[in-house]
Swiss-Prot record:
Its cofactor is Zn(2+). The lineage of its organism: Eukaryota, Viridiplantae, Streptophyta, Embryophyta, Tracheophyta. One of its GO terms (molecular function) is coniferyl-alcohol dehydrogenase activity. It catalyses: (E)-cinnamyl alcohol + NADP(+) = (E)-cinnamaldehyde + NADPH + H(+); (E)-coniferol + NADP(+) = (E)-coniferaldehyde + NADPH + H(+); (E)-sinapyl alcohol + NADP(+) = (E)-sinapaldehyde + NADPH + H(+); (E)-4-coumaroyl alcohol + NADP(+) = (E)-4-coumaraldehyde + NADPH + H(+). Homodimer. This is Probable cinnamyl alcohol dehydrogenase 1.
Length: 357
């Protein structure tokens, strides 16, 4: 196990200010505690939330800030009380690295709703050290917030599942939408949206992609396996599709009207919000009243659900569509992500980027 009290440093790529530009940054890892594992990072996905974080879009960022919360790595050290993992295991780390363990949500195994949850970056751990994310050589994480990657699953493919994948799996699981034969809509075809199509199809759903243009029609239907494609500005087609969907997963990360999409839902249908939007959304109340429809939200998923989701994706052969880049390309990747110029998730080859050279 090595000396658990020896202070270690690691190298990551951090933003220093709201410009969001990342550059190399050396910092101290916290000590490996009794229930901690040290993870050598292999791959880390790039999520739209990383953009919000490094650019301080929500007014809560503290710098220097190492982003990255779709982390796949190899266990290189374990604390004496670790029972779930051993050195050499391939594991994943998502957006959370801590919670209080005592509140209602924690006792219900939905720790993502704990008021004292600890984010994997831009937060402070229980020992007072700042948390830093997966665009780095290594991390130290409590074993509760680490999951084993199923044997045979490619690590670069697993990375986006730890945020994009669980973000769509959790609401489908919680709201009772796992059974086959349902009709679902995916609003927005980015990193989360493309996983929504794949996971919903694997559950046996009829899936309609809803987008603002025809640009992604061929991709959605021929490559991702969607059953239908709606352009939201095509009023005739939108009218034809009214009252047809059991649910819509809304992944759009910018302000947009809700009423056109509420009209697509059946009675008791759910519009499930996923995008992080810092401006108010508007709708008129009869749009929900007259169909007993719901506007709700969901936030990533629990550790238990994440394990279930990984097993589900392995069993069903669900993979993510990715573009692998090295760390020295990360600022360009972020610029492209901001312009939606990626099909559909950037994954950083951290181990291949040789950060210590």
């Amino acid at each position: 196990m090595g000396g658990l009290e020896v202070e270690k440093t690691t190298i990551g790529w951090a933003a220093r200010d709201p410009s969001g530009v990342l550059s190399p940054y050396t910092y101290t890892l916290r000590n490996t505690g009794p229930e901690d594992v040290e993870v050598k990072v292999l791959y880390c996905g790039l999520c739209h939330t990383d953009l919000h974080q490094v650019k301080n879009d929500l007014g809560m960022s503290n710098y220097p800030l190492v982003p990255g919360h779709e982390v796949v790595g190899e266990v290189v050290e374990v604390g004496p009380d670790v029972s779930k993992f051993k050195v050499g295991d391939t594991v994943g780390v998502g957006l959370l690295v801590g919670s209080c363990r005592n509140c209602g949500p924690c006792k219900r195994d939905i720790e993502q709703y704990c008021n004292k949850k600890i984010w994997n970056c831009n937060d402070v751990y229980t020992d007072g050290k700042p948390t830093q994310g997966g665009f780095a050589k290594s991390m130290v994480v409590d074993q509760k917030f680490v999951v084993k990657i199923p044997e045979g699953m490619a690590p670069e493919q697993a990375a986006p599942l730890l945020c994009a994948g669980i973000t769509v799996y959790s609401p489908l699981n919680h709201f009772g939408f796992k059974q086959s034969g349902l009709r679902g809509g995916i609003l927005g075809l980015g990193g989360v949206g493309h996983m929504g199509v794949k996971i919903a199809k694997a559950m046996g759903h009829h899936v309609t992609v809803i987008s603002s243009s025809n640009k992604k029609r061929q991709e959605a239907l021929e490559h991702l396996g969607a059953d239908d494609y709606l352009v939201s500005s095509d009023t005739d087609k939108m009218q034809e599709a009214s009252d047809s969907l059991d649910y819509i997963i809304d992944t759009v990360p910018v302000g947009h009207p809700l009423e056109p999409y509420l009209s697509l839902l059946k009675i008791d249908g759910k519009l499930i919000l996923m995008g992080v939007i810092n401006t108010p959304l508007q709708f008129i109340s009869p749009m929900v009243m007259l169909g007993r429809k719901s506007i709700t939200g969901s936030f990533i998923g629990s550790m238990k659900e994440t394990e279930e989701m990984l097993d589900f994706c392995k069993e069903k052969g669900v993979t993510s569509q990715i573009e692998i880049v090295k760390m020295d390309y990360i600022n360009t990747a972020m610029e492209r992500l901001e312009k939606n110029d990626v099909r559909y998730r950037f994954v950083v080859d951290v181990i291949g980027s040789k950060l210590d050279q």
